[in-house]
């Protein structure tokens, strides 16, 4: 997983390789639950949460509309055309179902559910075939914004060279940060703690301190 600098999106970069000598017919499923941006709704007021959001699907993009925020939208999309989707948690997990045995995976197909109100999730399905030794790469994109923003991000990061460039950019960014001060001790673990981990934690705290 990686977050490109300057973008409000999380990229799940997934590679699947067939290491056997047989052709494999596979299905990839995503699953996540959207946040309400409010801990009282997310973790406590479960009755109110049933009326706080709606979900829809169009052109390979799941959009969640947060009714209590004028511009509150979230999306899930990918660099492939989905073969199925579900936006309602109970449809994917099943009635009284859990993530251990989701009904959608047991069926092998998703139901195409959307709803105004209720509990929402983001599940996309992609069926694909891999020849022996063949590898497939999928990029799933979870971000802040409406469907139009999702389309922009989908076009941008469906180009795998741009995904690779995100890693290069982040590596260069942190290399510059770390280069400001390097301390060497006889203990390699202490070096990592001082030169990498402590600096990283300090940077993250500064980023989130005013939010």
Language-model features and meaning:
Residues 20, 32-34, 136, 144-148, ...:
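Short loop/turn segments at secondary-structure transitions that flank enzyme active sites
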Residues 1-2, 111-115, 125-130:
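Beta-strand-rich interaction surfaces with strong enrichment in secreted/lumenal proteins
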């Amino acid at each position: 997983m990686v977050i490109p600098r300057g973008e409000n999106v999380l990229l799940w970069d997934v590679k699947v390789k067939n290491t056997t000598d047989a052709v494999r017919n596979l299905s990839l499923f995503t699953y996540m639950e959207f946040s309400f941006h409010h801990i009282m709704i997310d973790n406590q007021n479960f009755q109110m949460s049933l009326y706080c959001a709606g979900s829809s699907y169009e052109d390979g993009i799941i959009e969640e509309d947060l009714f209590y925020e004028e511009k509150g939208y979230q999306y899930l999309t990918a660099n492939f055309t989905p073969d199925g989707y579900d936006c309602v948690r109970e449809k994917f997990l099943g009635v009284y179902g859990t993530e251990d045995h989701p009904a959608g995976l047991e069926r092998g197909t998703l139901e195409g559910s959307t709803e105004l109100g209720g509990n929402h999730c983001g599940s996309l399905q992609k069926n694909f075939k891999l020849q022996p030794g063949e590898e497939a790469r999928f990029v799933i994109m979870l971000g802040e914004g409406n469907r139009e923003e999702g389309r922009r991000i989908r076009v941008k990061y469906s180009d795998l060279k741009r995904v690779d460039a995100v890693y290069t950019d982040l590596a260069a960014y942190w290399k510059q940060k770390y280069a400001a001060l390097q301390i060497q001790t006889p203990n390699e673990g202490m070096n990592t703690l001082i030169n990498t981990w402590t600096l990283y934690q300090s940077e993250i705290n500064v980023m989130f301190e005013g939010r």
